[in-house]
């Protein structure tokens, strides 16, 4: 199974690149984790936000292909670390690759939300999307460490 993070935005601060890459390199070869960046639509005073969301959503869904789609969204289901580890195990048993979608400043398109098999809420707080990349990578790595009895996670 391959994990794929599909995120809107291409120019991240150095600390995001550093943090995300740190966890990316830790994933084992039998569970590769990749980042697919979707260029953010141009937003301005007279921007058609609905159309921008639609276009970003189309690109995200195209990147995900036939993968299981999990959206990152405030109204999603909050998983604690053991629950995320259990989800990771279920995803592995399912056999399909998994695409986790992070929207842009206005969130995810209705099409992305409709295509999602699951929706995961990291927090009831609104989090900056660059930070979410790092949180998701660390959380998934920690979940993997639980499923393999790796010493990274301690009870």
UniProtKB/Swiss-Prot annotation:
It is an enzyme of class 2 (transferase). It is found in: Cytoplasm. One of its GO terms (molecular function) is rRNA (pseudouridine-N3-)-methyltransferase activity. It comes from the Bacteria. InterPro entries: Alpha/beta_knot_MTases, RlmH-like, tRNA_m1G_MTases_N. Its EC number is 2.1.1.177. Pfam families: SPOUT_MTase (PF02590). It catalyses: pseudouridine(1915) in 23S rRNA + S-adenosyl-L-methionine = N(3)-methylpseudouridine(1915) in 23S rRNA + S-adenosyl-L-homocysteine + H(+). The keyword Cytoplasm applies. S-adenosyl-L-methionine binds at residues 72, 103, 122-127. Its main location: cytoplasm. Keywords: Cytoplasm, Methyltransferase, rRNA processing, S-adenosyl-L-methionine, Transferase. GO terms for cellular component: cytoplasm. Specifically methylates the pseudouridine at position 1915 (m3Psi1915) in 23S rRNA. HAMAP family: 23SrRNA_methyltr_H. Belongs to the RNA methyltransferase RlmH family. NCBIfam families: PRK00103.1-1, PRK00103.1-4, tRNA_RlmH_YbeA. Homodimer. This is Ribosomal RNA large subunit methyltransferase H.
């Amino acid at each position: 199974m391959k994990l794929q993070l599909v995120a809107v935005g291409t120019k991240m601060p150095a600390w995001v690149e550093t943090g995300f890459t740190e966890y990316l390199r830790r994933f084992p070869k039998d569970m590769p984790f990749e980042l697919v960046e979707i260029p953010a639509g141009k937003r301005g005073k007279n921007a058609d936000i609905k159309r921008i969301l639609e276009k970003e959503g189309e690109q995200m869904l195209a990147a995900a292909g036939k993968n299981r789609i999990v959206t990152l969204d405030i109204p999603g289901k909050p998983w604690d670390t053991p629950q995320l580890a259990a989800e990771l195990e279920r995803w592995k048993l399912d056999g399909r690759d998994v695409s986790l979608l992070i929207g842009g400043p206005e969130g995810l398109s209705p099409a992305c939300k409709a295509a999602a098999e699951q929706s995961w809420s990291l927090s009831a707080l609104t989090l900056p999307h660059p930070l979410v990349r790092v949180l998701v990578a660390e959380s998934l790595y920690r979940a993997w460490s639980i499923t393999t009895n790796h010493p990274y996670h301690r009870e």
